[in-house]
Amino acid sequence: MERGSKVKILRKESYWYQEIGTVAAIDKSGIKYPVLVRFEKVNYNNVNTNSFADTELINLGK
């Protein structure tokens, strides 16, 4: 997984569950949710990004 990769969200409580987003950044410092994902649509707070753990994502490639 790298910046620009398409990913599918597996976190059930997420607004974007089962949606496809694009990896915007990956933090290598050891935090719990290091992968920042950007989406086409916004959530109820008008936000289009969220952080996820590697285990909550399926990498679909570029």
Curated annotation (Swiss-Prot):
GO CC field = chloroplast thylakoid membrane; photosystem I reaction center
Q: Name one GO biological process term.
A: photosynthesis
- SUPFAM superfamilies given in the database record: Electron transport accessory proteins
Q: Which organism is it from?
A: Pyropia yezoensis (Susabi-nori)
Query: Could you tell me the keywords of this UniProt record?
Result: Chloroplast, Membrane, Photosynthesis, Photosystem I, Plastid, Thylakoid
UniProt-recorded name of the protein: Photosystem I reaction center subunit IV
InterPro entries under this entry?
A: Elect_transpt_acc-like_dom_sf, PSI_PsaE
Subcellular location as annotated: Plastid, Chloroplast thylakoid membrane
Main location per UniProt? plastid
Note the Pfam families from the entry: PSI_PsaE (PF02427)
User: What membrane topology term does the record carry?
Assistant: Peripheral membrane protein
Cysteine-cysteine disulfides = none
Q: Family per UniProt?
A: Belongs to the PsaE family.
Please describe what this protein does. Stabilizes the interaction between PsaC and the PSI core, assists the docking of the ferredoxin to PSI and interacts with ferredoxin-NADP oxidoreductase.
